[in-house]
Swiss-Prot record:
The gene is METTL2A. The modification N-acetylalanine is found at A2. It catalyses: cytidine(32) in tRNA(Thr) + S-adenosyl-L-methionine = N(3)-methylcytidine(32) in tRNA(Thr) + S-adenosyl-L-homocysteine + H(+); cytidine(32) in tRNA(Arg)(CCU) + S-adenosyl-L-methionine = N(3)-methylcytidine(32) in tRNA(Arg)(CCU) + S-adenosyl-L-homocysteine + H(+). GO terms for biological process: tRNA metabolic process; tRNA methylation; tRNA modification. This is tRNA N(3)-cytidine methyltransferase METTL2A. S-adenosyl-L-methionine binds at W78, Y82, G188, D213, D239, L240, I260. The keyword tRNA processing applies. InterPro entries: Methyltransf_12, METTL2/6/8-like, SAM-dependent_MTases_sf.
């Protein structure tokens, strides 16, 4: 099992790394004194037991007919999920500003500049060619969110929700948010648990946020949210795996792309092309931020026989799917797309249910990969 400080991570980032907290379990007898412990190392016995559990729940695979159904009707399963839970399943992700300082006001470019300086690289301008320019999923946040209370009476949004982005005339001069000086895209935005905290926290008039999701129901919930402001945000339905559909922005126009527990939801064979397409949207010096499930996370170990689709890829009871990554797999995906590693680390967290005296070991992977600056060969 990889440690909390993976090999190959920039030393300067490892030295500064405080994001995941500093509550370490040094005395096992105190495990139930807090709700969570950070950077928990696994014993060899624990790692071996996790591997055996995965082998056991992977023996019996879902039949091919059902696998085809889960792929063809993936949008239906996600729409059903959001119709049931609406905006009450996940908490707003205010932790993002700690884990990803690039998203915090006035720090988005400074943090990136620091990294380039520390790595003796030229500092990117992060501007365009003009003058400025899911214990079912995630962390089982079954809490309502005040910021996600949507209007009960709104105009129909079906036309806006289902608009075909491929029909838009995308050019470098005019597109949604074309006058912005800093552009962020979240892929797999759900009901806005990342987007709205960003918009609420950052009042920079030059900021524009794009957000898309596979589920038209999720996008409708975003667009009917009282916090949704079309002058600062553009929400649209998009299939990450559809090579025929374009994004509503030109290539080389985005500063940040966010992937939070979304890449794991698609078929592994389609991941590389999806990342390749997203990479082309980044400006030179732009950053891709990811947080997703790691191999042997508690959610993976809880799957039963008959839920495995392929190696480390499973289907939940509601028909949605999830993959569990290794650091090496994610590094290959990003570097093959032409991005450079800034951060790739494992967050091993021990969550505790003090009432039931239960311990739950979570494994997540967090990545930051940067698009290289333009060179003479590009």
């Amino acid at each position: 099992m990889a440690g909390s400080y993976p090999e190959g991570a920039p030393a300067v980032l490892a030295d500064k790394r405080q994001q995941f907290g500093s509550r370490f379990l040094r005395d096992p007898a105190r495990v139930f004194h807090h709700n969570a412990w950070d950077n928990v190392e696994w014993s060899e016995e624990q790692a071996a037991a996790a591997e055996r559990k995965v082998q056991e729940n992977s023996i019996q695979r879902v039949c091919q007919e059902k696998q085809v159904d889960y792929e063809i009707n993936a949008h239906k399963y996600w729409n059903d999920f959001y119709k049931i839970h609406e905006n009450g399943f996940f908490k707003d992700r205010h932790w993002l500003f700690t884990e990803f300082p690039e998203l915090a006001p006035s720090q988005n470019q400074n943090h990136l500049k620091d990294w380039f300086l520390e790595n003796k690289s030229e500092v990117p301008e992060c501007r365009n060619n003009e003058d400025g320019p899911g214990l079912i999923m995630e962390e089982q946040h079954k809490c309502s969110s005040k910021s996600l209370e949507h209007k009960t009476q709104t105009l129909p949004v079906e036309e806006n929700v289902t608009q075909k982005i491929s029909d838009l005339e995308i050019c470098a001069d005019e597109f949604p948010g074309s006058s912005a000086t800093y552009r962020i895209l979240e892929v797999g935005c759900g009901v806005g648990n990342t987007v709205f905290p960003i918009l609420q926290t950052n009042n920079d008039p030059g900021l524009f946020v794009y957000c898309c999701d596979f589920s038209s129901t999720a996008i409708e919930l975003v667009q009917t949210n009282s916090e949704y402001d079309p002058s600062r945000c553009f929400a649209f339905v998009h299939d990450l795996c559809d090579e025929e559909k374009s994004y509503p922005v030109p290539k080389g126009s985005l500063d940040i792309i966010i992937l939070i527990f979304v890449l794991s939801a698609i078929v592994p064979d389609k991941m590389q092309k999806a990342i390749n397409r997203l990479s082309r949207l980044l400006k030179p010096g732009g950053m891709m931020l990811l947080r997703d499930y790691g191999r042997y996370d508690m959610a993976q170990l809880r799957f039963k026989k008959g839920q495995c689709l392929s190696g480390n890829f499973y289907v939940r009871g509601d028909g949605t799917r999830v993959y569990f990554f290794t650091q090496e797999e994610l590094d290959t995906l990003f570097t093959t797309a032409g991005l450079e590693k800034v951060q790739n680390l494992v967050d091993r967290r021990l969550q505790v249910n003090r009432g039931k005296q239960l311990t739950m070991y979570r494994v997540w992977i967090q990545c930051k990969y940067c698009k290289p600056l333009l060179s003479s060969t590009s």
